[in-house]
Design a protein with these regions (language model features):
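Cys-nucleophile CN-hydrolase/nitrilase-fold catalytic domain and related Cys-dependent amidase chemistry
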Residues: 17, 22, 26-106, 112, ...
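Short beta-strand scaffold segments in enzyme catalytic cores
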Residues: 84-86, 99-102, 138-140, 217-219, ...
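Short loop/turn motifs at secondary-structure junctions
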Residues: 5, 33-34, 146, 168
Length: 274
């Protein structure tokens, strides 16, 4: 049994990275809890709503920049693994990548994911300023967890989670900037529960809060039960993950073992064939 102490940092982002970093420092700087994994939301760098793509590109950085450097220092100083997000400059300016970095206790980057499925629904066009990544995240071992990564809107794509579960993920972390709207909080909860139950994994959602975003950071266990729901407001939301529960649940519900994946792959190929 491995117990992993997790913190989800829920906050309202600024309209620049300087403003956002000030908020982040205020939340985590005075936090005394001992943690194994600290997770930050999507769009942590800034709230892009209504901003010009050129401005966002100007705020964006490379992985070796000061923004990621802050989180690498946080990891090594706190002796905690960190999942952080940024707008990363792409090869298609003024578009950026919506990027997640996974950092180990020593401050080393051990995983990078660029969001592949972009939020182009409900009147919003993320593709107007973001370039999609080209591959799913391959789970990594950090702080006692085999950890996968998906981003916000990708909760609506079960395949993103299924592939990582089949690759051994015990938990999938989901940095999210979940926009407000009718039934959006309920949608977030239902999707997180479904992804957990059908893959028998923990789903860890770190969500932004504020005038544009719902909050409701949460951890869902392998049975689909919400372990903690952060509600609204700026806060650090804590939970403890027990990795042994993943394997106990998979003994009772061997969904991954029973899946007819080769058959389904052929069905997918036929379904999407022009």
């Amino acid at each position: 049994m491995v117990l992993v102490r997790v913190a989800l940092v829920q906050f309202e982002p600024g309209r620049s990275k300087v403003e956002s970093l000030r908020v982040i420092r205020g939340l985590v700087g005075g936090y005394e809890g001992k943690l194994d994994l600290i997770v930050f939301p999507e769009y942590s760098m800034l709230d892009p709503t209504g901003l010009d793509a050129g401005f966002i590109y100007g705020e964006a950085e490379d992985l070796g920049g000061g923004w990621v450097g802050f989180f690498r220092d946080l990891a090594s100083t706190r002796n905690s693994c960190v999942v952080a997000t940024l707008f990363e400059r792409s090869r298609e300016p003024p578009k950026v990548y919506n990027t997640v970095v996974v950092i180990d206790r020593g401050g080393d980057i051990v995983g990078v994911y660029r969001k592949t499925h972009l939020f182009d629904i409900l009147g919003y066009r993320e593709s107007s300023f973001i370039a999609p990544g080209g591959s799913l995240f391959k789970p990594v071992d950090v702080c006692g967890l085999r950890l996968g990564v998906a981003v916000c809107f990708e909760l609506r794509y079960p395949e993103v989670f299924r592939v990582q579960a089949l690759r051994g993920a015990e938990a999938v972390v989901v940095p999210a900037g979940w926009y407000r709207g009718p039934l959006k909080e309920e949608t977030l909860r239902v999707l997180a529960q479904a992804r957990s139950h059908e893959n028998v994994i923990y789903t860890i959602v770190a969500a932004l809060y504020g005038s544009n975003f719902t909050g409701r950071s949460m951890v869902v266990d392998p049975y689909g039960v919400v372990v903690v729901d952060g509600g609204v407001g700026e806060k650090v939301v804590e939970a403890v993950i027990d990795t042994s529960l993943v394997y106990k649940a998979r003994e009772k519900m061997p969904l991954l073992k029973l899946g007819r994946w080769s058959m389904l792959l052929e069905e997918f190929r036929e379904a999407i064939r022009p």
